[in-house]
């Protein structure tokens, strides 16, 4: 009850577990990696080595994941609550006056977009890798999007059957994450799916964003709706879109674009 009062009613941000992946003597910027659903900070180990430049690089465990808190109150894993926790992490680094770049994958990209809406003066650019951005309710959905949303609702409402389905999908290589051994382990993932992905308003957020944004997605990604992303690129000139030959997980070509764009942005700031 106290946890709910403190973090829900008083809106005190949660303290996320964060891993410092690189420390530079004279960092030109701070880069924060934000993982996707059912993952954790460790997923960025290879990506960190592919970022070129003198940066301090961090990776966080989002609420409900890894070593971060796993609260049970409704809404604890919403995008706004996650973004507040990322802001706390940025402040505690004591280097938030440096240029800040957020790199999010999948659900983490939705958190990065929410952060840019809530704290536009804190972030210089966001990179959204494989973002599952879905249409507003009043918009006309594609068949793929309709099926995805129905599948997500099924996972949330029927945990017994859905854990089998998800583990089968993981076994087929749809996502590079560990299989779930129990409902206790699976519960935070279902909460994230409901509160962050199903209940998102990221399309509306990005359609109005003033934060420089780069979206990179795979041509063969089964959970990303390419036409939604391309539409955002058309209606907002702050958003640049790139499609690569990949599925859902981050690839070397994605991280290479991130690295080049960060260094380009820093040169343009001089």
Name these PLM-found stretches:
Residues 138, 153-208:
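Conserved alpha/beta-hydrolase catalytic His-Asp/Glu region
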Residues 113, 117, 126-155:
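Flexible "cap/lid" loop of the alpha/beta hydrolase fold
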Residues 209, 215-217:
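Short beta-strand/loop motif that positions the catalytic acidic residue
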Residues 19-69:
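Conserved HGGG/HGGXW glycine-rich cap/lid loop of the alpha/beta-hydrolase fold
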Residues 1-32, 52-56, 89-97, 133, ...:
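Alpha/beta-hydrolase fold catalytic core
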Residues 246-259:
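Catalytic histidine-centered segment of alpha/beta-hydrolase-like enzymes
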């Amino acid at each position: 009850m106290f946890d709910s009062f403190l973090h829900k009613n008083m809106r005190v941000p949660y303290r996320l577990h964060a891993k410092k992946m690189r420390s530079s003597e004279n960092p030109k910027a701070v880069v924060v990696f934000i993982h996707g659903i059912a993952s954790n900070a460790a997923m960025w180990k290879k990506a960190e080595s592919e970022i070129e430049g003198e940066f301090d690089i961090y990776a966080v465990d989002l609420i409900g994941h890894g070593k971060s808190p796993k609260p049970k109150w409704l809404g604890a894993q919403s995008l706004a609550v996650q973004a507040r926790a990322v802001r706390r992490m940025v402040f505690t680094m004591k280097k938030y006056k440096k240029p800040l770049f957020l790199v999010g994958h999948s659900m983490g990209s939705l958190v990065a977009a929410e952060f840019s809406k809530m704290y536009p003066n804190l972030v210089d650019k966001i990179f959204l890798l494989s973002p599952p951005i879905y249409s507003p309710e009043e918009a006309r959905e594609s068949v793929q999007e309709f099926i995805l949303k129905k599948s997500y609702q099924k996972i949330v409402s029927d945990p017994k059957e859905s854990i089998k389905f998800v583990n089968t999908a993981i076994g087929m290589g749809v996502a590079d994450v560990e299989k779930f051994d129990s409902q206790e382990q699976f519960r935070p993932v279902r909460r994230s799916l409901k509160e962050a992905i199903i209940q998102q308003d990221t399309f509306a957020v990005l359609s109005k964003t003033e934060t420089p944004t780069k979206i990179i997605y795979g041509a063969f990604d089964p959970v990303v709706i390419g036409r939604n992303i391309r539409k955002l690129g058309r209606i907002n000139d702050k958003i640049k879109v790139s499609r690569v030959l990949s599925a859902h997980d981050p690839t070397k070509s994605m991280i290479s674009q991130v690295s080049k764009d960060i260094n380009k942005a820093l040169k343009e700031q001089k």
